[in-house]
């Protein structure tokens, strides 16, 4: 999992979902797990 300042480019990838967990914003991607990230 990467920590990124901006998740805008990742959320446009096919299969990406933006999820909020415990006050943090995550992008999870079941199709392409390389694009997992947390905003920070």
Swiss-Prot record:
> What InterPro entries does UniProt report for this protein, alphabetically?
Ribosomal_bL36, Ribosomal_bL36_sp, Ribosomal_L36_bact
Q: Return the GO cellular component terms, semicolon-separated.
A: ribonucleoprotein complex; ribosome
The domain of life is: Bacteria
GO terms, molecular function: structural constituent of ribosome
Keyword field: Ribonucleoprotein, Ribosomal protein
Keyword Hydrolase among record annotations: no
> Which processes are annotated in GO (biological process)?
translation
Protein family: Belongs to the bacterial ribosomal protein bL36 family.
Q: What is this protein called?
A: Large ribosomal subunit protein bL36
Q: Per the UniProt entry, what species is this protein from, by scientific name?
A: Corynebacterium diphtheriae (strain ATCC 700971 / NCTC 13129 / Biotype gravis)
């Amino acid at each position: 999992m990467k920590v990124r300042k901006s998740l805008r480019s990742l959320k446009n990838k096919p299969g990406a979902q933006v999820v909020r967990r415990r006050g943090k914003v995550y992008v999870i991607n079941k199709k392409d797990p390389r694009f997992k990230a947390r905003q920070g």
